[in-house]
Amino acid sequence: MTDYKATLNLPDTAFPMKAGLPQREPQILQRWNSIGLYGKLREIGKDRPKFVLHDGPPYANGTIHIGHALNKILKDMILRSKTLSGFDAPYVPGWDCHGLPIEHKVEVTYGKNLGADKTRELCRAYATEQIEGQKSEFIRLGVLGEWDNPYKTMNFKNEAGEIRALAEIVKGGFVFKGLKPVNWCFDCGSALAEAEVEYEDKKSSTIDVAFPIADDAKLAEAFGLASLAKPAAIVIWTTTPWTIPANQALNVHPEFTYALVDVGDRLLVLAEEMVESCLARYELQGSVIATATGSALELINFRHPFYDRLSPVYLADYVELGSGTGIVHCSPAYGVDDFVICKKYGMVNDDIINPVQSNGVYVPSLEFFGGQFIFKADQPIIEKLREVGALMQTAAIQHSYMHCWRHKTPLIYRATAQWFIGMDKEPTSGDTLRVRSLKAIEDTKFVPSWGQARLHSMIANRPDWCISRQRNWGVPIPFFLNKESGELHPRTVELMEVVAQRVEQQGIEAWFKLDAAELLGDEAPLYDKISDTLDVWFDSGTTHWHVLRGSHPMGHETGPRADLYLEGSDQHRGWFHSSLLTGCAIDNHAPYRELLTHGFTVDETGRKMSKSLKNVIEPKKINDTLGADIMRLWVASTDYSGEIAVSDQILARSADAYRRIRNTARFMLSNLTGFNPASDLLPAEDMLALDRWAVDRTLLLQRELQEHYGEYRFWNVYSKIHNFCVQELGGFYLDIIKDRQYTTGANSKARRSAQTALYHISEALVRWIAPILAFTADELWEYLPGERNESVMLNTWYEGLTELPADFELGREYWEGVMAVKVAVNKELEVQRAAKAVGGNLQAEVTLFAEDGLTADLAKLSNELRFVLITSTASLAPFTQAPADAVATEVPGLKLKVVKSAFPKCARCWHCREDVGVNPEHPEICGRCVDNISGEGEVRHYA
């Protein structure tokens, strides 16, 4: 038997079938580094339009988790796709370096008695070490960026830039010092930002407390009575007994109806709607003897239950019904609403009672409870209330309560003297910060769109921003306060620039070591030098100033506004939020044009990642076992706008999809063996109809993919590339061209036409996958035929694809119809194979009984229909002649009959043909193969 293998154009490529990503990816990273890929991208991007994605800095603490990986990969995919779209898309990664978590880590490691200077030194060293660890992990993900020169909020230039940003906001008239209740953590010993507050369940004591009337006549008058026949009291309900010693007022709603209830031994004031539930709670019988609106009770004095002072009634719209008594006890030092109401009624700061120290312990001088920790004082306070006859009822509840994000301990609101950026303070010129920010939100594009309403609601309802902290490791607030007036030095902005210049040379230590006389001269004794530091959200919130127009200038001619900020959805109250406020205060617009948010990672059942649940997926483990490209494909395959599921099973599915894409690319490469695009590429008009369709289909898909990339819809990109590989290519086109590729002449038009199509498709595909499968794309790039530069990323979307003319006879709709017929034939072939009626498809002969229109269409392929259907014979017959055993299909007007061929199998092409052995010199092969070996070769027109 003759071996005809040498006469075939068998596929061949050195591109490995097995990806071996964990081993190969580090080699590719090394290559990118050695050729200076990121630098080359900046070089070719010089004259391109710029796209600026500004990196929200992760905190310089700990190893990266899967959420970090998701975030960085999304950013990299966007920037790579923008580069391929013809933009200059730089990426400057950054780190958030100051703040309590690092200071806390240093204190835990070295103790709390280090001294401020040593603490800062150790914090800086710790942050530096953490950044190096995280940096190598991010690079391993295939993220291209300026890793040799990232921005760090602790770099001297950035610290100085932050001071300059603050100076701009001071100049704008937004900064003030005030006594206000702020989120306070006893363990931190400092105020916390809104973004540092978490809510967890807490068990608390609830109490109903009676405040006895101090002015009987006024209360009687308010209820339309001549006098009060019995002692009277107003009843409040609270979940914070520890605030009772600081009570200074009682709040009622001006429009609610309040009842005077006779309960036998006294009269109680309660909201009318709450009378029934309150009496049931107190186990009392009673009757309503009079009612009055809340506004009638204004300024009536009641007595504190155990201190000799008065508590007047103030009107407050925030009072609600539904729980409690309809009366809210008011401690202005420990509640934002309480504080606002008391200030509205003329209470000055010196009158506010604030007995809780920074560590959560009452001042020693507080009568009855001095020296006690507030959360342990609930019971002594309850006992005191019971002793004086003021306790109506007590119970325990489980409720959602604010906790420190770092220590997981309960917080309180505590009035302290702090520095604020005012939301409604009249600035030097223009609108208030709240008005500016709300307008800026309207001018910003949000992906997904619901982010706009979320951020709008937060800005509309937020209090003034407390920007000061009482910590060591932070950028200083370099203010001098007049000891007498409490006012800022008149040259504050000028002095801040002098300080910024020193910080730029020496770091924040320059301020802390500064002798005031160096700057103020003879004025120094008149001023206090402030030791507060800035909220870390101010650090990251001003990166648009100290990075984009500071340490790493980049942006557009219209100003350094970024095109995109991309972070997790929690950043609506974090980085997006603080950046919006500082941007509007400094520039009167948001520092970004578009906000994109992604959800959080969960396991496949929707549970959060937790070590206790043993469902944590570490990026390093994925890199070491599957490869970063599999992680990147998982990211691309998921709609990131909601929760993003990840597990070993989900990653395994991504690995399967990866193999399909890789194998498709490898098949095309292997069939490009011996193809030189410089000499073998055919013009479109010389290509076979099927090949022209394949290139046209690739072009249409490329347009769709470019649109999806532009909208950051990577899951659409992934699914369409995968489907293209599985269906149009793997399930149709690549199957059909195998015979032509392998059996026709090596330099025949039939083969070169297919190779031309494969070349065009491969050139397009390698670019499509480059933003997602960063490593694999560059590996594939090296094996493509023809001269090329060092990386796929140094190019733009492929422009060599051609469109089918509108009048092309075998156009798009035609091939869609043929594909449907092929699917129907394949389905019947599977049935026949399962029944052992035929072996392989090439043992089959198929007759298509079709209606006239379909017959005419299929007849256009002439005798090449069999190559499309991959059967040895394909015959057409009228639909009306279909025998009873012909099989109906899902294609209208088509029935099929498949039989096993009676003809011998060609040893070369494996088709069963009647002319096998006709040529005595080649008794084992068909006439077509004889012609391809020793004759002029077959001529194909369509497929």
From Swiss-Prot:
The protein's Enzyme Commission number: 6.1.1.5
A GO term for molecular function: tRNA binding
Keyword ATP-binding: yes
Subcellular location: Cytoplasm
Entry binding sites for Zn(2+): 906, 909, 926, 929
Any one biological process term the GO annotation gives: response to antibiotic
One Pfam family this sequence matches: tRNA-synt_1
UniProt short sequence motif 'HIGH' region, positions renumbered to this chain: 58-68
Domain notes: IleRS has two distinct active sites: one for aminoacylation and one for editing. The misactivated valine is translocated from the active site to the editing site, which sterically excludes the correctly activated isoleucine. The single editing site contains two valyl binding pockets, one specific for each substrate (Val-AMP or Val-tRNA(Ile)).
Oligomeric and partner information: Monomer.
NCBIfam families: ileS
Family: Belongs to the class-I aminoacyl-tRNA synthetase family. IleS type 1 subfamily.
Protein purpose: Catalyzes the attachment of isoleucine to tRNA(Ile). As IleRS can inadvertently accommodate and process structurally similar amino acids such as valine, to avoid such errors it has two additional distinct tRNA(Ile)-dependent editing activities. One activity is designated as 'pretransfer' editing and involves the hydrolysis of activated Val-AMP. The other activity is designated 'posttransfer' editing and involves deacylation of mischarged Val-tRNA(Ile).
Listed name of the protein: Isoleucine--tRNA ligase 1
